[in-house]
């Protein structure tokens, strides 16, 4: 069996896909297959991908109607054969030793090799117990919440991870991670070397967050945590919702923010569990003045 399957979902990435492909094929760890999923591109992306089929036998190309990035990733998983799976976005690149560094974290006692260890702390622990890592994942600490830059054992990468409606196109990676960390009981291996070079995510540049979207996204996030674990991770889940509210509220007008289901649900939960949260968090939510929110976010949080 191939060691690593690298899956790249592609949509109208003609200006970046060649550099992305070259960075993968030039890896020092060459026991890999590269699966390029052309998700209905209307530019030259698909044609560029096809030129690599004859150049390198490790390359496979899938052409499909446009279904969105999440569906494209799952299509790649279905056609892959590697024992381990990783994802790369079409506008990103891998440092030459990225896969080699990640593969050093592979062992029989892990299903996940987390390659963004530098984002958690300066520590050099080689693994983190799954219970502790779940707390980090639910709070979205560091770079947890992005599918790239890590390895996943094939047995835990199931269709359930990608089962989302197409319009959930921002924040969906976090749902993937939450579902993933509750699909294994094994410790998570940690890699601290640089394993990913991020490009520009043009989708995030044009996406407009709304309070209704935040509410729906949060419903999927909550459902990703199994019912038996909801009480254990409640504080972490609420902290993450507050953090998300801080992040998007500067773009919302005061009336919409105060009246939104997303805000009201957070406020209700915070009142019930107020002892678990800081004065700053409670004060921020209690006084939703735009100027006050901006001041607190800048100077206190």
Please report, for each region that a protein language model flagged, where it lies by residue:
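Flexible acidic/His/Gly-enriched loops in nucleotide-sugar-dependent glycosyltransferase catalytic domains
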Residues: 95-163
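Membrane-interface aromatic/basic loop that binds lipid-linked glycans or pyrophosphate carriers
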Residues: 251-301
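Catalytic core of nucleotide-sugar-dependent glycosyltransferases
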Residues: 185, 194-201, 206-270
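Short aromatic/hydrophobic "clamp" motif used to bind/position activated sugar donors
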Residues: 85
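Conserved nucleotide-sugar donor-binding catalytic segment
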Residues: 134-213
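Short, acidic, metal-binding catalytic loop of nucleotide-sugar glycosyltransferases
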Residues: 22-31
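A conserved acidic beta->alpha catalytic loop
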Residues: 23, 38-47
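Glycine-rich, basic loop-to-helix element that forms the pyrophosphate-binding segment
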Residues: 64-80
């Amino acid at each position: 069996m191939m060691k690593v399957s690298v899956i790249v979902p592609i949509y109208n990435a003609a200006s970046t896909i060649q550099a992305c492909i070259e960075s993968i094929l030039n890896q020092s760890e060459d026991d890999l297959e590269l699966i390029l999923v052309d998700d209905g591109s209307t530019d030259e992306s698909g044609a560029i991908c096809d030129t690599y089929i004859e150049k390198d036998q490790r390359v496979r190309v899938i052409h499909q109607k446009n279904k969105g990035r999440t569906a494209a990733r799952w299509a790649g998983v279905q056609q892959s054969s590697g024992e381990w799976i990783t994802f790369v976005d079409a506008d990103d690149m891998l440092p030459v030793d990225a896969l080699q560094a990640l593969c050093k974290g592979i062992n029989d006692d892990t299903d996940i090799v987390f390659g963004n260890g530098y984002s958690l702390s300066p520590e050099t622990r080689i693994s983190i117990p799954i219970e502790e890592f779940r707390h980090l994942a639910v709070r979205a600490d560091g770079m947890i919440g992005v599918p790239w830059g890590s390895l996943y054992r094939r047995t835990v990468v199931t269709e359930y991870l990608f089962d989302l409606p197409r319009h959930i196109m921002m924040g969906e990676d976090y749902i993937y991670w939450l579902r993933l960390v509750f699909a294994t009981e094994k410790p998570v291996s940690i890699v601290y070397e640089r394993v990913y070079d991020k490009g520009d995510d043009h989708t995030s540049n044009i996406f407009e967050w709304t309070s209704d979207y935040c509410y729906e996204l949060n419903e999927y996030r909550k459902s990703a945590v199994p019912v038996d674990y909801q009480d254990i991770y409640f504080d972490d889940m609420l902290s993450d919702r507050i953090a998300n509210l801080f992040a998007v509220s500067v773009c919302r007008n005061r009336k919409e923010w105060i009246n939104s289901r997303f805000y009201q649900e957070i406020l209700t939960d915070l009142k019930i569990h107020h002892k678990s949260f800081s004065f700053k968090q409670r004060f921020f939510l209690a006084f939703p003045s735009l100027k006050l929110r901006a001041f607190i976010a800048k100077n206190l949080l």
